[in-house]
Amino acid sequence: MVLSPADKTNVKTAWGKVGGHGGEYGAEALERMFLSFPTTKTYFPHFDLSHGSAQVKGHGKKVADALTLAAAHVDDMPSALSALSDLHAHKLRVDPVNFKLLSHCLLVTLAAHHPAEFTPAVHASLDKFLASVSTVLTSKYR
């Protein structure tokens, strides 16, 4: 999915507001996903999935850091996320639908924390951005 210049600006501005809360928001989005879509828990059999778990917080930070990297390299996400794409395709073998589920939960989390800034235009831009990240992460599945 091609991001317009306005989309790129919206993504960088919105993700910039996440600031030091990336790990917190990532963990919250994961918790939302586990509660709303319980089948996603199967990819984390070794995790303590309880609220506030250090493992969920740690993985939430990894998710946020990957999205920060993608936002910083929005014009070349395939190169920036290549190692992560390899990991998910060849080692973790995550079902691609799970990226869509997590993306939805990330949007809900961002909207809950930044309602004034979460305009329809920002929502659409973030949705396109997350769809692009998902496409990159699943590009090596073949």
Curated annotation (Swiss-Prot):
Residues in Globin domain copies: 2-142
Residues recorded with modification Phosphotyrosine: 25
Gene assigned in the entry: HBA
Binding site for O2: 59
Tissue distribution of the protein: Red blood cells.
Lineage top rank: taxon: Eukaryota
Protein name (record): Hemoglobin subunit alpha
Homology family: Belongs to the globin family.
